[in-house]
Amino acid sequence: MEKKLNVKLDEKVGEGTYANWFMLTFSPSEFVIDFGRILPGLPDAHVYSRVITTPQHAKMFLQNLQKTIENFESQNGEIKLPGAMPDNHGVGFKNS
């Protein structure tokens, strides 16, 4: 029997933080995901949150995110992505 998990959400965390940029790095034992923002006309991204997790949890997150995107697209249509952008373009998302 699966146990119910009670999730506590701090009010400040519940407000959320907007991110239009992220960067992923890893070592043999962990994945690091930085979430940040790039503002028009500014050359730098500001990191607002860093999540560090195990490779196993990173893969479970990937699977959960993929399923959630599939559900979203089945209800709202395909999410369109811009064409290929160079890593230093400064807008959108980046994988390392």
Positions of PLM-derived features:
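Positively charged, low-complexity terminal tracts
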Residues: M1-S96
